[in-house]
Structures are given as C-alpha cells and as structure tokens.
Amino acid sequence: ILEAQTEENISFVLTDTAETCEKYPFHFALHIGYELCKNEVKVNWTVENTDTKELYFSIGAHPAFNCPVHGEENKTGYGLKFGGLADTIHHHGNTPDGMAVMEDKVLALKDGCVTFTEGFFDECTYMVEGKQTGEVSLLDREGIPYVTVKFDTPLFAVWSPEGKNAPFVCIEPWYGRCDATR
C-alpha cells in the first residue's frame, strides 16, 4: 500500500493479514522507502513488530544490474570492486537447491577487485558474511565502476545464473540467509 509520496521519495507499507498469517504467523508492518538523491537511489527497510511476541524474520534485496553494458557478448573481463578490501574476501557458496555450504572459501583480489572469467559464476552464489565490506561496485572491462551498491547489512550475496550467460549480475544486501547444510 502506498504510504507517502513526494517528487523525490516514495514509501510503501505491507501489514499482516489473515492470508499472510497462514504462512508467516506474526503481526508486522514492513515499511519500504525509496529516495532519489542526484544519481543515487536510497532504499530503506523498516520491519515493525506490531505484536508483543518476538518477531523472527530475514529480509534482503534482490537488485540485478545489466552486465555487460557496452554491447559485449558476455561478462568476461567485467568485474567487482569490494570497498575497503585489498587482497582477499572470504565467502561460501550454496547447493543447487539453495542451502548454504559453510565451507570457508577465499576469493583472491587485486587492489580490492576481481575480474570475471568464463565460469566465474559456476559456483552460482558468493555469500559473504561478517560485514567484510559495505560497498560493492560493478566494473566494466576498463575497470571503471558503473554501478555501486552501498549497504549496512551483516551479509550480502553476488551471483548470476550459472551456465546461462545471463545479461545481469545481482548484488544483494541481506539480513539473514538460507539454512546451511552440515
């Protein structure tokens, strides 16, 4: 439901209903706001507990960004820059059915950057926990950032569908993730 709107801002609210309570038995109000500020879009989530019992939830964004952007056939040579990092980032992957695999893996970086090679996304998803960075940029083949996602979440994921040469990369800030295999 539209909550408020100005020329630069818009906000929506989702509240629990009898139908939502069938699958998610909690009373809540989810407020999502968008603000245009020069060449940025700022997104704000507020999860409000409208009950007296504890509210369990996870929330995350699912933005996808065009890649490649200059008419190339694939993403090879494009890349990512992880703000504030230099040599490595720790991550883990997931199973084909979406379960997290908690085996610690290290992605080598050069000056905080990694370049996409053929098969880079064959692991499907790079899940990064522990607030290792709060900024991820997509880089074109010249190493120039063309989109940057800034966030203050405990984890994020970067992925593109494996083996499909999909024309996008997702950079997803998350509060919570899928369950893990053991």
Predicted regions mapped to residue ranges:
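Active-site pocket scaffolds in enzymes
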Residues: 145-182
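Active-site scaffold segments
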Residues: 42-44, 62-64, 168-174
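Hydrophobic residues positioned within well-ordered beta-strands of beta-sheet architectures
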Residues: 10-12, 30-32, 43, 59, ...
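Active-site/ligand-binding surface loops and adjacent short beta/alpha elements
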Residues: 54-56, 64-151
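Short glycine/proline-enriched turns and hinge-like loops at secondary-structure junctions
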Residues: 24-27, 57-59, 162
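Extended, loop-rich substrate-binding clefts of extracytoplasmic carbohydrate-active enzymes
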Residues: 1-38
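Short, well-ordered beta-strand segments enriched in hydrophobic/aromatic residues
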Residues: 34, 41-49
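Surface-exposed, gly/pro-biased binding rims or lids
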Residues: 18-19, 85-89, 98-100, 169-182
